[in-house]
């Protein structure tokens, strides 16, 4: 009798645990929006974390979108700034920001990718995210207007979007990460 009661209690516990999801892995993919707001000139640590988080999320099976907003739009603009504009630079601040070799080695190890396939600068990194991993990258068109940025001067990985499309990105996201 005692043994039957123990078996019955164990069965009830197992049924309860299964019904509330204990012991099952919740592995559904999320739609993640990374809201990148801070320019490289203001805080390089924030903007440089964005591609690492994006890659890690993609590797975990999530869909990732990056929204470049606020002062960060200046970091994806070719020749931004009076001096770069004067000399006609065709690079962005992200293109000029190298990935330290120790970070490249760490990414190679963590992501299981040969070192020669790891980008050398953050501009290449954003291209890699978009072209190899399928990350969508958008930029706030209104903020570009405020900074007097011609959308044609924005990095090719970034698609300028109006405010209504930005709002759609926010409402469609399951999770929003802000940098």
Language-model features: where?
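Positively charged n-region of N-terminal signal peptides that target proteins for export
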Residues: 1-4
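Bacterial N-terminal signal peptides
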Residues: 9-21
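A ubiquitous, low-specificity "background" feature that marks scattered single residues
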Residues: 8-9, 75
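Short hydrophobic/aromatic patches at helix-to-coil boundaries
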Residues: 176-179
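Secreted/extracellular ectodomain signature
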Residues: 25-174
């Amino acid at each position: 009798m005692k043994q039957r009661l123990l078996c019955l209690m164990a069965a009830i516990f197992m049924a309860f645990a299964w019904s509330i999801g204990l012991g099952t892995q919740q592995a559904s993919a999320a739609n993640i929006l990374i809201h990148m707001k801070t320019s490289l000139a203001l805080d390089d640590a924030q903007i440089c974390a964005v591609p690492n988080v994006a890659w890690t999320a993609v590797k975990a099976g999530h869909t990732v979108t990056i929204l470049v907003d606020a002062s960060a739009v200046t970091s994806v603009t070719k020749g931004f700034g009076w001096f770069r504009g004067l000399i006609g630079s065709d690079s962005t601040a992200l293109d000029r920001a190298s990935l330290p070799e120790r970070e490249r080695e760490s990414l190679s190890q963590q992501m299981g990718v040969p070192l020669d396939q790891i980008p050398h600068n953050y501009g290449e990194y954003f291209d890699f995210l978009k072209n190899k991993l399928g990350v969508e990258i958008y930029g706030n068109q209104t903020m570009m207007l405020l900074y007097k940025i011609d959308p044609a001067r924005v990095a090719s990985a970034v698609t300028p979007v109006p405010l209504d499309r930005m709002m759609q990105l926010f409402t469609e996201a399951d999770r929003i990460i802000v940098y």
